[in-house]
Amino acid sequence: MPSTTTAAWRVGADVGGTFTDVVALGPDGRIVPMKVLSTPPAYGEGVVAATTAAITTAGASPAEVGAMLHGTTVATNAILEKDGAVTALVTTSGFRDVLELGRLRRPTLYDLGWSKPPPLVPRRRRAELNGRIHADGTVDPPHTPEDVARLAMRIRGSGAAAVAVCLVNSYLRADEERRVADELRSLLPGRYVTASVDLGAEPGEFERTSTAVVNSYVGPVVQDYLTALERDLVAAGVTVPLLVMQSGGGLLDAGKVGRDRSRSSSPDRRPV
């Protein structure tokens, strides 16, 4: 976590659907709270307004802010409102239905009328890659650049703005999955690409696939929000790094949250 200046103001901001709350803590222990109306859809404007108001009320200047901490439910809202990025999935041949197969567990075992929620990536945007990582870590047949290029062309035609990559047994060969993801980034500039092993190189194809899909689904939304918020804070005179609260209670630089940890930002978020 980036270091903060102790002899300066520390500001914490939390955004809700109705109000945006900011608390400024001075170097002398003084606390200045501020509440303003939230500003959807540009919620960052409310954060900047509340921060500026709190610091001004304290008789300080934005340049005296030594730490800027932020909790946000932008990713949660994108999932609940089905307002995330159009996402594609790249997986091993024969495994594109893993999102729908899931696990045996279901929330209402005896409810005959229960319907499984539709996956965030429909079947038409799930692409199968030839090649296979086996249980011993060997790759046979290999994932060729030609096959990756073929899938990239299909993804480009689907209109997807984000891509999740999850290959079977990739936790044994993280380098192989990352290579495929890097090739897709090169072939699909401007798309948000997630490799499942970058979130958790662990066994469990359904868990890794669904987590990578959620990360890609909300990633562009979170990235755009945090980029705009950082820009507006700097314009207002707050130049310290923006730190975002994670589901584990820790803080992460906003640049890393937007890049590869979108699905775990904010304290009320849990991996899906």
Roles of regions detected by a PLM:
Residues P2-V272:
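N-terminally biased helix-coil "hinge/interface" segments that flank
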